[in-house]
């Protein structure tokens, strides 16, 4: 799954990366704490590492994907790859909170 960073909220020990993807697009982490590897779409050179919590824009405590420490520095509008979302991504997706289902390209 490819998603875009819409906002980065600075925190005390970690920053919150708000993505345009949400729990309605990928329900597995919210449903049963499934882990999906998160990667930047572009690797940056340098040693600048940060701690991030990757979350969706829905105001739900379960709308979160992962917490990663020592991730490369990110900026708003960067693209993020969420790996191994599987064949059941679309069937588990919903229109929760009046959000459209994700676009699926085969």
Q: What does each of the following model-derived ranges do?
A:
Residues 1-106:
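Charged (often Lys/Glu-rich) extended helix/loop segments that serve as interaction or gating elements
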């Amino acid at each position: 799954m490819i998603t875009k960073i819409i906002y980065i909220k600075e925190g005390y020990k970690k920053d919150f990366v708000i993505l345009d993807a949400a729990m309605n697009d990928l329900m597995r982490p919210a449903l049963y704490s499934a882990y999906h590897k998160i990667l930047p779409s572009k690797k940056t050179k340098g040693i600048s590492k940060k701690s991030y919590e990757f979350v969706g824009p829905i105001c739900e405590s379960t709308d979160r994907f992962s917490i990663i420490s020592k991730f490369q520095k990110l900026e708003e509008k960067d693209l993020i790859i969420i790996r191994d979302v599987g064949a059941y991504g679309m069937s588990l997706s919903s229109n929760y909170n009046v959000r459209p289902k994700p676009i699926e390209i085969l």
